[in-house]
Amino acid sequence: MATNAKPVYKRILLKLSGEALQGSEGFGIDASILDRMAQEIKELVELGIQVGVVIGGGNLFRGAGLAKAGMNRVVGDHMGMLATVMNGLAMRDALHRAYVNARLMSAIPLNGVCDNYSWAEAISLLRNNRVVILSAGTGNPFFTTDSAACLRGIEIEADVVLKATKVDGVFTADPAKDPSATMYEQLTYGEVLDKELKVMDLAAFTLARDHKLPIRVFNMNKPGALRRVVMGEKEGTLITE
């Protein structure tokens, strides 16, 4: 199989959904999936790629149901941020067990648990080939973890945001509901907006577009997909200018 000898990206921002960590379980963290993801991230580090990671929290907390019951949105979002910290702690531990140097940073201060987010420190760690896990979203309510991924991706000057999902890429329709749906290999930001394709929420997507930050959507459940993406092979959907 012909592959590039060297990775096409030097620094990436990997966005993992919380749901990806729960595996076939309906809730929580599947240890085997966590360890597999840690091994795939380790492969990237061994290729010399600098890796920032943003993880969602949907496997541990879902605010929608409580919001319907009357919970304040700000409170729900704060709980969601803490869920991402819990996932970050689990990922840091899995990386350490895989002998990968990793640092967990939080956008909200949690002294004694993890470091406070510092842009300068994050850049320094990445340059020294440390995996940096960026948790607690943006630190503000009303912003999704996709927004956090794009914001941090821009801040750390990542070459791309790699959005790991449960499907192979961006499709013409929901492949779970429409068997005739086909996958796009490449799209422009404008095409995504015109076709109203579900890539990420509008705030996150326009942030990436305005800063010309490429997004690649791929299936994290497919073994080796992450490596294929960084080696420039055909995998997932690329969204650029």
From Swiss-Prot:
What HAMAP family does its record include?
Answer: PyrH_B
- What's an example GO BP annotation here? 'de novo' CTP biosynthetic process
Domain of life of the native organism = Bacteria
Q: Which GO terms describe its cellular component?
A: cytosol
Activity regulation summary: Allosterically activated by GTP. Inhibited by UTP.
Q: From which source organism is this entry?
A: Citrobacter koseri (strain ATCC BAA-895 / CDC 4225-83 / SGSC4696)
Q: How does it assemble?
A: Homohexamer.
What residue spans carry the region label Involved in allosteric activation by GTP?
23-28
Q: What pathway, per the record?
A: Pyrimidine metabolism; CTP biosynthesis via de novo pathway; UDP from UMP (UMPK route): step 1/1
Positions bound to UMP: G57, D77, T138, G139, N140, P141, F142, F143, T144, T145
Would you identify the family this protein belongs to, as annotated? Answer: Belongs to the UMP kinase family.
Keywords linked to the UniProt accession:
Allosteric enzyme, ATP-binding, Cytoplasm, Kinase, Nucleotide-binding, Pyrimidine biosynthesis, Transferase
Keyword Magnesium listed? The answer is: no
Q: EC number(s) on record?
A: 2.7.4.22
Q: Which GO terms describe its molecular function?
A: ATP binding; UMP kinase activity
Q: Which residues bind ATP?
A: K15, L16, S17, G18, G58, R62, T165, F171, D174
Q: Which SUPFAM superfamilies match?
A: Carbamate kinase-like
Its function, per the record, reads: Catalyzes the reversible phosphorylation of UMP to UDP.
Q: Which reaction does it catalyse?
A: UMP + ATP = UDP + ADP
What is the name of this protein?
A: Uridylate kinase
Q: Where can this protein be found? A: Cytoplasm
Q: Which InterPro entries match?
A: AceGlu_kinase-like_sf, Asp/Glu/Uridylate_kinase, Uridylate_kinase, Uridylate_kinase_bac
